[in-house]
């Protein structure tokens, strides 16, 4: 099958934003203008096309990144047809993982900001993720028709809070209820959209007199940004004081793709103004799969290899998301980086070393699907029939193995125990939790060995609430949920040397393992590190992996209260063996005993998860909010003024103190304050807290 759309005309983009910046509405409008949706879905009615899980429609927030394909030829139909693969990403901080995994497979992103709220805490998180994956960005300032809308304030906030380099390519005509259109700084024309046609029709007019000077000032800034792309452009700009339309676009495009600038647009998606110009900017300024460096990975021999975005290359794709579909079962969303994948073919999961057969291939439009025979380089599609794949693994041509860089998922910080209500629910719950954990790598399931309870862990209360809710709706499992528990950790403060000896003499063959280890604190975040410093074979080579294994098996249960031990370095430096009685198991036991004894002597401490909390509150309630945060052992790290007499408080608070905060904040501020929180780091718990936690576990 020949390509319908050349790869240069592909745009794989994400629409990303803070909750309530109007992201889903913006995506809806994109689908409307590109002709996919005939009736615009409104989030207010719970009818948006991209928010297709029931919980999303009820809560009016987007949880899963739905992937959609649509086509655009430009506002004036002046471009050849471009193919957009759009990933809608959630804005709630508990679903940061969803944003992270979509950033990994995007070539560009549109950041949507609210013209009133501006750059909010979640926007900063998303911005960091986009920077981490070097994703070129455009910014769209939405809700220009709202009370308090201020485009230029958002430009300043982007510089201050995100350390961004925003370059407006349009400026608004009017604001709040007087917002009527935009001045296009590239064409130096005013654009007015026709409300009766839901923004399908528009016309160019002269720039209103009172805006002429402002428009010229901002055009000057845009020209400078474009001219900095190359010496040639800079010289032309300095000589002529201007650049042609084509050269402005070329200069801005080059610098946007290099992540040096972020072109800015504005509008109101709800009132059908401005989104159309943003779509043109996606074509003009964001990269196609061939404009970005080839994707890098390693082959079977751990040698670096690259794959270009080309159909003639060997097939390589990244599975970036799993979803359970009520009709076809498990869907695996893949981003194809190189080559072609046909339905019915066998591919290699290079991470697990297993081959799998691709059943059907579906192109998704939110939750509607169209079956296709093959998927080409640069595309995003969903495969049916893959059983072993989990998020972040590579699928490739079995004749040319490659492992693409994996995604790193955060460790969960909150646990709850779940118990099925009936015996019949027991088995169904196991299947349901297994499916949900395969879909979402930041969600873990385990069985507590002592109590036999099933423990689920995630990134926040809302995260777990929604997963329990999905268990009920999608799998018909009724479960009772316990109170949330904090994921504490244990660490040590001083180095110690310790002997471990496991000797068992009984008739016949005995057991003998003997080691000396040095246990010392490791850098924060480094985790466990094992160093083999054995000289002269005092512990034979073949037993050293057993020592490492014995140590690793002891890590999940610390000596203070049985919490996992983190950030330790263990050096095996001496020991002895017995020709007949030594075996792997004996050395494993000796290492485990040495570790436990060493840990007790190494000043063990309890670590608790600290959360970065951002509260937005009316000034009148500032005292209550601050007092409450200090009462929760919070450390206030900064305050900012926000528009409309609001204040922003940033604090670091232990997770243990944050349960039920939403309800408390509501009553403190009569429901007028909002907050967001995300995991920051682990830090040593105060003595009184540690003692209470340890006594509780006994």
Curated annotation (Swiss-Prot):
Residues 8-290 form the tr-type G domain. One of its GO terms (molecular function) is translation elongation factor activity. Belongs to the TRAFAC class translation factor GTPase superfamily. Classic translation factor GTPase family. EF-G/EF-2 subfamily. It comes from Aromatoleum aromaticum (strain DSM 19018 / LMG 30748 / EbN1) (Azoarcus sp. (strain EbN1)). Catalyzes the GTP-dependent ribosomal translocation step during translation elongation. During this step, the ribosome changes from the pre-translocational (PRE) to the post-translocational (POST) state as the newly formed A-site-bound peptidyl-tRNA and P-site-bound deacylated tRNA move to the P and E sites, respectively. Catalyzes the coordinated movement of the two tRNA molecules, the mRNA and conformational changes in the ribosome. PROSITE patterns: G_TR_1, G_TR_2. Its main location: cytoplasm. Keywords: Cytoplasm, Elongation factor, GTP-binding, Nucleotide-binding, Protein biosynthesis. It comes from the Bacteria. GTP binds at residues 17-24, 88-92, 142-145. The lineage of its organism: Bacteria, Pseudomonadati, Pseudomonadota, Betaproteobacteria, Rhodocyclales. One of its GO terms (biological process) is ribosome disassembly. It is found in: Cytoplasm. One of its GO terms (cellular component) is cytoplasm. This is Elongation factor G.
């Amino acid at each position: 099958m020949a390509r319908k759309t050349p790869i240069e005309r592909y745009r794989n983009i994400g629409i990303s934003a803070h909750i309530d910046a109007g992201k889903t509405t913006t995506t809806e409008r994109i689908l409307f203008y590109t002709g996919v949706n005939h009736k615009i879905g409104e989030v207010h009615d719970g009818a948006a096309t991209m928010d297709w899980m029931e919980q999303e429609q009820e809560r009016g927030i987007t949880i899963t990144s739905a992937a959609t394909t649509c086509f655009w030829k430009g506002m004036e139909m002046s471009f050849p047809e471009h193919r957009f693969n759009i990933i809608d990403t959630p804005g709630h901080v508990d679903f940061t993982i969803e944003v992270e995994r979509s950033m990994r497979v995007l070539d560009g992103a549109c950041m949507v900001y609210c013209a009133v709220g501006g750059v909010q805490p979640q926007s900063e998180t998303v911005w960091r993720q986009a920077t981490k994956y070097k994703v070129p960005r455009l910014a769209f300032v939405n809700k220009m028709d709202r009370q308090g809308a201020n485009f230029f304030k958002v430009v300043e906030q982007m510089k201050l809070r995100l350390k961004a380099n925003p370059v407006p390519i349009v400026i608004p005509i009017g604001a709040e209820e007087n917002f009527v259109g935009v001045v296009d700084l590239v064409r130096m024309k005013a654009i007015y959209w026709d409300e009766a046609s839901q923004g399908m029709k528009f016309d160019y007019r002269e720039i209103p007199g009172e805006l002429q000077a402002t428009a010229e000032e901002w055009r000057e800034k845009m020209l400078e940004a474009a001219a900095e792309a190359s010496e040639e452009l800079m010289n032309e700009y300095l000589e002529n004081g201007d650049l042609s339309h084509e050269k402005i676009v070329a200069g801005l495009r080059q610098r946007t793709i290099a992540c040096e600038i972020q072109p800015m647009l504005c509008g109101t998606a709800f009132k059908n103004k401005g989104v159309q110009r943003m779509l043109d900017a996606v074509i003009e300024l964001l990269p196609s799969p061939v404009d970005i460096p080839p994707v890098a990975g390693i082959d079977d021999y751990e040698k670096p290899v690259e794959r270009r975005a080309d159909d003639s290359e060997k097939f390589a794709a990244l599975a970036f998301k799993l979803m359970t579909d009520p009709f076809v079962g498990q869907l695996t969303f893949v981003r194809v980086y190189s080559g072609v994948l046909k339905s019915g073919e066998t591919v290699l999961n290079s991470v697990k070393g297993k081959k799998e057969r691709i059943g059907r291939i579906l192109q998704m439009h939110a939750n509607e699907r169209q079956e296709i025979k093959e998927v080409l380089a640069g595309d995003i599609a969903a495969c049916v029939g893959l059983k072993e794949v989990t998020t972040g693994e590579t699928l490739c041509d079995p004749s040319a193995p490659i492992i693409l860089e994996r995604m790193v998922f955060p460790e969960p910080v909150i646990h709850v125990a779940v118990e099925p209500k009936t015996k019949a629910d027991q088995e169904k719950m196991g299947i349901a939790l297994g499916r949900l954990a395969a879909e979402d790598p930041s969600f873990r399931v385990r069985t507590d060995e002592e109590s036999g309870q099933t423990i689920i862990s995630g990134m926040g209360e809302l995260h777990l609430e929604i997963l329990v809710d999905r268990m009920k709706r999608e799998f018909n499992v009724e479960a009772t949920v316990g109170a949330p528990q904090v994921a504490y950790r244990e660490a040590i403060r001083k180095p110690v040397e310790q002997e471990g000896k496991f000797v068992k003499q009984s008739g016949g063959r005995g057991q003998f393992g003997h080691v000396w280890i040095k246990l010392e604190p490791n850098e924060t975040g480094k985790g466990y590190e094992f160093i083999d410093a054995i000289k002269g074979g005092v512990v034979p080579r073949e037993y050293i992996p057993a020592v490492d294994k014995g140590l690793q098996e002891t890590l999940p249960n610390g000596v203070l209260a049985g919490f996992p031990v983190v950030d330790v370095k263990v050096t095996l430096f001496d020991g002895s063996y017995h020709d007949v009685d030594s075996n792997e198991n004996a050395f494993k036991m000796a290492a485990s005993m040495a570790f436990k004894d060493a840990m007790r002597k190494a000043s063990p401490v309890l670590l608790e998860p600290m959360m970065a909390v951002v509260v937005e509150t009316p000034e009148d309630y500032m005292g209550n909010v601050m007092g409450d945060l200090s009462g929760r052992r919070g450390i206030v790290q900064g305050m900012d003024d926000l528009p409309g007499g609001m204040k922003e408080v940033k604090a670091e608070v232990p997770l243990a103190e944050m349960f039920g905060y939403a309800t408390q904040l509501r009553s403190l501020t009569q429901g007028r304050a909002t907050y967001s929180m995300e995991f920051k780091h682990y830090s040593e718990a105060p003595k009184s807290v540690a003692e209470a936690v340890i006594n509780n576990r006994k």
